[in-house]
């Protein structure tokens, strides 16, 4: 998710979440690294690669020359991936995910990026041609290979293109090569989800994690790591509720190299190329520790004034949800919120003030309470006017300081040009020559006519220079040094902050540290320097009436009736959008077809009377089906990138008779929307009409070749294991000897669960050839590894909770860190006033994570452990103790529930989780072990708070949290929520299993 500046903001606000990656040797060749050595960064179980974060920098790097051919790109991908694996060294699972067909909600952003990329490539090509002509006119010789070479089209990194098909083949070969040749990979299970598998790469990875969590044998202490450059990986890591989670990424701010210019490419020597390659190989990487971020959020989000128990998992979900308003890939951010202006902190403060009044959290398991959303945004709306004014004042201050800084640099440069040429060896007696811009003065001090004259202010500021015209060179040099030192001091004191007090203090410092000078009034500065280009901002958010001007300017409407109509529709669509995004993060894609149909977002003040806007029908999504690869290509690519499409489809982009020609404008408007940088502008492209597009493509599908049809087909993930893996013999025998169509396997055996299916492209006794024409890598004997199609376990409702058996990390933050977060290092006699409920008293000397192990987080209301805990306590109060032999298999206080047991749901009895049992956490008589049948009924009749009716293995509970929502029901084509509700909220019947009640919560 593109949230510019988010990573930098997080790392500055929460500094301990970042640590450098320790590398043994980053210059080794492929295959030479000792993958099996202990990891100096700490051991990891599973590594997830968002491959688009590797493919993009390898195929079109910004700081060095791009590879000459696609084969070179793939070899660079191998080398880069091998380096990442050496850092992480996963021991159990490696999943490689490439972006597949995206949901329609993401295609709008992809379309904007690719159209602008094609436009930038065109401008760069024209500039290159101009510079070549200019150099040749000066007599320089330009290599014909450089002149005739076109830049590679990065839009080829889109599902359905020949490049992505070749990338998938290359990755499959490389994984097989590593399994066959690297002993450290012997027990590693590798899943490749290439571009033929629908879904964004990072969300396919999250779906995999959720699917593994749903297995009853899943180890809650699995250590996860995800690699990628997108900021939303941080949110996704939090959304898994897996505290043993890290994010690995390049340190993009270390040794920042400027983007390579065209002139550099035309004149770069081989030594320069080698130097850049050496620097690139040493680029540092960073860990982002999600467990430490959870510690920070636990302190910051804790509110001592709640009328209900503080639940960290639910609070984190609310925090992730609030970050969506600041920026995401599916919706424009609210105008009043920006990461650079601390928009997240502003919204969190509103949330903390409102939460005691809300009486519950805003989100639950990916579902929204829309009434609470309205109250949150209403609290923000009171600040909008002030936010816009302060933002404008800050921008003006920055502009003024930039102007002063630029003018000071120009003055300093002019003074250097005046003094330095006159200071030469052996000419001590030579007088200084007056600058041509200096006024010629008569003996009376009047300026002589016919000479350039400076303003009175310039004369005053330069009077020392004028009066020292006859000084010796030595004196002039000393004067110059003193003046330059003064200028440097002046410049260092001009880092103006947003605080008026600091500004005033710095102004005083300027007066004290400069000789015979003072800060120039800004009106004079503006009069002397060219004015900056106007951004065409007609809204002027900092002035009254901006909301009216916003809708009039952006939508071309005038009447109040039209404005209100657009405003209401935007609010409804935006509410659908935030509901869609939250479900997408926590449960998977709720609808492949939904998208936000506007380029702009409403104001926080517009979110009023939400129930009237939404209506009784609420917010519902229909799952639908993803686009095919060619349908996405036709939706997001400009005509200039049509070469990535089959010829029979490409013609629709440029043929004047094409019925969808209007989808591909060559010129389009960019609305700067009050921003300064071109990349921050909004590309006003027409939205794709899905029906028109599909009808046009359907007429031409029959003209495709067999290879082209193959690229347009959606497929499954592929699983690779070595012949040393413990599942190798079983998979081989069942699929090839016994001809079983598909084979399910559980988590306990190899720390991976799912279903394997025979892969038609894999021949067990065949040969896998090296697919590239460049490079020297061998063909592989298929007997060295095993390849099959792979399906994840059946999807179940994800729960925002820690899984029982989780062993926490040793706490990282100190009391000083807590005070810094709570009080900003300003204790003011209130040392540690608001202690969080989990302080040092919660440590026990127990557990494998260190000398001290933090106690497991308190059980969530509605959680399975809470259910068993309450069941046991009430039986102890009202029933006679049962014999010990009746309690044996269900005692949750004995050694089988210790922290050292990762799977403590009776997994030592009856072979773990018997398939025939409806309740996998105990046997069928577990309730009778606690009480008789009558007391079991009492839990349904007397205690509605703990009325669960748990009908599946993983806790789709019926609880008292009021979250069988009406707002975000989505049609799963029969895969509905399995929970039932007896707490007073009557669900509406729905054949797909969607339930809703009257209180505004969707499920």
Curated annotation (Swiss-Prot):
<keyword id="KW-0269">Exonuclease</keyword>
<keyword id="KW-0378">Hydrolase</keyword>
<dbReference type="InterPro" id="IPR017151">
    <property type="entry name" value="Xrn2/3/4"/>
</dbReference>
<feature type="coiled-coil region">
    <location>
        <begin position="389"/>
        <end position="419"/>
    </location>
</feature>
<dbReference type="InterPro" id="IPR041412">
    <property type="entry name" value="Xrn1_helical"/>
</dbReference>
<dbReference type="GO" id="GO:0034244">
    <property type="term" value="P:negative regulation of transcription elongation by RNA polymerase II"/>
</dbReference>
<dbReference type="GO" id="GO:0110103">
    <property type="term" value="C:RNA polymerase II termination complex"/>
</dbReference>
<comment type="subunit">
    <text>Interacts with RAI1; the interaction is direct, stabilizes RAT1 protein structure and may stimulate its exoribonuclease activity. The interaction also stimulates RAI1 pyrophosphohydrolase activity, probably by recruiting it to mRNA substrates.</text>
</comment>
<protein>
    <recommendedName>
        <fullName>5'-3' exoribonuclease 2</fullName>
        <ecNumber>3.1.13.-</ecNumber>
    </recommendedName>
</protein>
<dbReference type="GO" id="GO:0030846">
    <property type="term" value="P:termination of RNA polymerase II transcription, poly(A)-coupled"/>
</dbReference>
<feature type="coiled-coil region">
    <location>
        <begin position="690"/>
        <end position="730"/>
    </location>
</feature>
<keyword id="KW-0539">Nucleus</keyword>
<feature type="compositionally biased region" description="Basic and acidic residues">
    <location>
        <begin position="117"/>
        <end position="145"/>
    </location>
</feature>
<keyword id="KW-0175">Coiled coil</keyword>
<keyword id="KW-0806">Transcription termination</keyword>
<dbReference type="GO" id="GO:0071035">
    <property type="term" value="P:nuclear polyadenylation-dependent rRNA catabolic process"/>
</dbReference>
<feature type="compositionally biased region" description="Polar residues">
    <location>
        <begin position="823"/>
        <end position="843"/>
    </location>
</feature>
<dbReference type="Pfam" id="PF17846">
    <property type="entry name" value="XRN_M"/>
</dbReference>
<dbReference type="GO" id="GO:0000448">
    <property type="term" value="P:cleavage in ITS2 between 5.8S rRNA and LSU-rRNA of tricistronic rRNA transcript (SSU-rRNA, 5.8S rRNA, LSU-rRNA)"/>
</dbReference>
<dbReference type="GO" id="GO:0004534">
    <property type="term" value="F:5'-3' RNA exonuclease activity"/>
</dbReference>
<dbReference type="Pfam" id="PF03159">
    <property type="entry name" value="XRN_N"/>
</dbReference>
<dbReference type="GO" id="GO:0030847">
    <property type="term" value="P:termination of RNA polymerase II transcription, exosome-dependent"/>
</dbReference>
<dbReference type="GO" id="GO:0110155">
    <property type="term" value="P:NAD-cap decapping"/>
</dbReference>
<keyword id="KW-0804">Transcription</keyword>
<dbReference type="InterPro" id="IPR027073">
    <property type="entry name" value="5_3_exoribonuclease"/>
</dbReference>
<dbReference type="GO" id="GO:0090730">
    <property type="term" value="C:Las1 complex"/>
</dbReference>
<keyword id="KW-0507">mRNA processing</keyword>
<feature type="compositionally biased region" description="Polar residues">
    <location>
        <begin position="991"/>
        <end position="1003"/>
    </location>
</feature>
<feature type="compositionally biased region" description="Low complexity">
    <location>
        <begin position="889"/>
        <end position="970"/>
    </location>
</feature>
<dbReference type="GO" id="GO:0000398">
    <property type="term" value="P:mRNA splicing, via spliceosome"/>
</dbReference>
<keyword id="KW-0698">rRNA processing</keyword>
<feature type="region of interest" description="Disordered">
    <location>
        <begin position="488"/>
        <end position="538"/>
    </location>
</feature>
<dbReference type="GO" id="GO:0019843">
    <property type="term" value="F:rRNA binding"/>
</dbReference>
<dbReference type="GO" id="GO:0043144">
    <property type="term" value="P:sno(s)RNA processing"/>
</dbReference>
<dbReference type="GO" id="GO:0071028">
    <property type="term" value="P:nuclear mRNA surveillance"/>
</dbReference>
<comment type="function">
    <text>Possesses 5'-&gt;3' exoribonuclease activity. Required for the processing of nuclear mRNA and rRNA precursors. May promote the termination of transcription by RNA polymerase II. Essential for vegetative cell growth and chromosome segregation.</text>
</comment>
<keyword id="KW-0540">Nuclease</keyword>
<feature type="region of interest" description="Disordered">
    <location>
        <begin position="107"/>
        <end position="145"/>
    </location>
</feature>
<feature type="region of interest" description="Disordered">
    <location>
        <begin position="821"/>
        <end position="847"/>
    </location>
</feature>
<feature type="region of interest" description="Disordered">
    <location>
        <begin position="874"/>
        <end position="1003"/>
    </location>
</feature>
<comment type="similarity">
    <text>Belongs to the 5'-3' exonuclease family. XRN2/RAT1 subfamily.</text>
</comment>
<feature type="compositionally biased region" description="Polar residues">
    <location>
        <begin position="495"/>
        <end position="515"/>
    </location>
</feature>
